[in-house]
């Protein structure tokens, strides 16, 4: 497997996923080692000189004006970790934890944090050997960074807390011992360097934006299947229409749908059956495309944050300087995560409306009510639409921005916070709900195609139809529907539809 070499400057979303989700090994680049050592040497000088520097020779937050003696610096750093580990709720999933560890190591490898090389190497060794700290999902204000959850990560490094190792939950001390990784004793600046950052919100956000990009392609596939099932009009996808407006995402979505439908005899032209389709079909490129454009923008900002120094204070070895700033503030990611949630929610909104057109006999251009031939005795897809509507409505609540909220903390020293991790967790929940809705549309569209009388389908939609039918048979009479929904979602989750279709018709945008 490809080894990911980090230096604090070159991390991208693809490499992040390889480590967080696929277990790729990580190592420091040589220049990163040099930079880490240089910044640590400067911190040691500050301690020896008893220079007053926030977080090195002072307390934290409201206690920043309390000077700490050289003899107390070790106790200061340990106390910081054990007192700040106040997370609550369920543990974050393994992939998010791995992402957090990777991003924190990457930020430290910039050499601006004043941490010892051996401590960074301990974090990387934990990642490579699969010692995954149990990090509760709740408790971060998003400024100063993700203090509480990151403290839970560091607990394991110092032999405290809990971790998962080889599938078992155990004490941090035991996990480190079994894995053969020595625990660390933190010295001046190191506790602060490890927990003062935005890596929790950024890790969750990176996973969400990566999956959302794939879902946006799957949504185009679902829309194309529904267009076939409803004998939709393809003229609205004409590239001239979308070039006239100029939005790249819109042009890409229309192009995707046309390529997916190429060769289909189930679609129509304007004037053959209708002059124009309803918005949920005709405006799909405009709606999906706006989400695609948002995802491009959000991905760019997330990748910047992946390579950011979000510590405080920041050490500048070349100038022999240290500056207290505010790079830990999560607002740049908080806004993007709220934007991400809204953008993904729109995918579900229009998908549910297309689903409604499939099941509603007044809107489906001749399909049987709720996609069952024996209505009354059978309910068919009636409650599938209910479930989709429920998820869409839940998304509307979740899409309320977290970043507009703030609550003062640390006796008003930290008087504006980002709530970025709440925004990221909400975006991930919206994504999961939206994936389910799109999965329901795919399921219903295949049923509608069967009931319409399947003829020659498009080059891409035929592949999608066959993959789904390999897993889920046509519904001839009522059966337990959640099982079919789950199977459809597993197909979407595996990205099998996108991967297979792209091998035949080329990459979807």
Show which residues each predicted segment covers.
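Polyanion/phosphate-binding surface patch
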Residues: 51, 66, 253
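FAD-binding core of FAD-dependent oxidoreductases
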Residues: 54-68, 72-76, 84-106, 136-158, ...
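Conserved short loop/turn motifs at secondary-structure junctions
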Residues: 32-33, 61-64, 112, 140-141, ...
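Well-ordered mid-protein domain cores that form the structural environment of catalytic cofactors
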Residues: 110-128, 132, 143-147, 168-187
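Short gly/ser-rich anion-binding loops that grip negatively charged ligand groups
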Residues: 66, 70, 86-90, 109-113, ...
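Glycine-rich, flexible loop motifs
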Residues: 1-14, 18-43, 47-50, 80-136, ...
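C-terminal auxiliary extensions adjacent to catalytic cores
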Residues: 2-24, 28-35, 39-47, 156-509
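Cysteine-centered functional microenvironments
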Residues: 135-140, 318-322
């Amino acid at each position: 497997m490809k080894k990911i070499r980090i230096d604090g400057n070159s991390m991208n979303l693809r490499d992040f996923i390889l480590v967080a989700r696929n277990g790729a090994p990580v190592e420091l680049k040589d220049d990163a080692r040099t930079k880490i050592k240089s910044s640590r040497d400067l911190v040691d000088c500050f301690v020896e000189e008893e220079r007053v520097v926030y977080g090195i020779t002072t307390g934290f937050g409201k206690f920043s004006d309390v000077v700490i003696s050289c003899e107390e610096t070790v106790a200061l750093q340990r106390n910081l970790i054990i007192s700040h580990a106040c997370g609550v709720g369920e543990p974050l999933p393994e992939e998010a934890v791995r992402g957090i560890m990777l991003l924190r190591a990457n930020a430290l490898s910039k050499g601006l944090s004043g941490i010892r090389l051996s401590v960074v190497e301990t974090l990387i060794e934990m990642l490579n050997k699969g010692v995954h700290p149990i990090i509760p999902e709740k408790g971060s204000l998003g400024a100063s960074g993700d203090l509480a959850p990151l403290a839970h990560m560091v607990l394991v490094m110092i032999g405290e807390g809990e971790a998962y190792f080889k599938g078992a939950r155990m004490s941090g001390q035991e996990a480190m011992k079994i894995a053969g990784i020595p625990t660390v004793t933190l010295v001046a600046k190191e506790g602060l360097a490890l927990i003062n950052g935005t890596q929790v919100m950024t890790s969750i956000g990176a996973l969400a934006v990566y999956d959302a990009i794939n879902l946006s392609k799957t949504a185009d596939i679902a829309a194309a299947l529904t267009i076939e099932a409803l004998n939709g009009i393809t003229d609205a996808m004409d590239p001239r229409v979308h070039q006239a407006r100029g939005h790249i995402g819109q042009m890409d979505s229309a192009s995707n749908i046309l390529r997916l439908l190429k060769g289909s005899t189930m679609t129509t032209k304007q004037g053959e059956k209708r002059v124009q389709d309803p918005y949920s079909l005709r405006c799909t490129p405009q709606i999906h495309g706006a989400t695609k454009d948002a995802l491009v923008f959000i991905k760019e900002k997330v990748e910047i944050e992946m390579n950011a120094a979000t510590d405080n204070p920041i050490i500048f070895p070349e100038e022999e300087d240290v500056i207290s700033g505010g790079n830990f503030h999560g607002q740049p990611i908080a806004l993007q995560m709220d934007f991400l949630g809204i953008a993904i929610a729109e995918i579900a909104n229009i998908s549910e409306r297309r689903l409604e057109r499939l099941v509603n006999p007044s809107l489906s251009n001749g399909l049987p009510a709720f996609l069952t031939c024996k209505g009354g005795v059978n309910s068919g897809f009636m409650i599938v639409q209910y479930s989709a509507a429920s998820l869409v409505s839940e998304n509307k609540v979740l899409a309320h921005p977290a970043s507009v909220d703030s609550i003062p903390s640390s006796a008003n020293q930290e008087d504006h916070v980002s709530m970025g991790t709440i925004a990221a967790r909400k975006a991930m929940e919206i994504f999961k709900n939206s994936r389910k809705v799109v999965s329901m549309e795919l399921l219903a569209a295949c049923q509608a195609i069967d009931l319409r009388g399947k003829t020659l389908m498009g080059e891409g939609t035929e592949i999608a139809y066959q993959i789904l039918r390999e897993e889920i048979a046509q519904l001839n009479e009522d059966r337990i529907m959640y099982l079919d929904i789950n199977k459809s979602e597993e197909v979407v989750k595996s990205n099998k539809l996108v991967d297979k279709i792209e091998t035949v018709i080329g990459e979807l945008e």
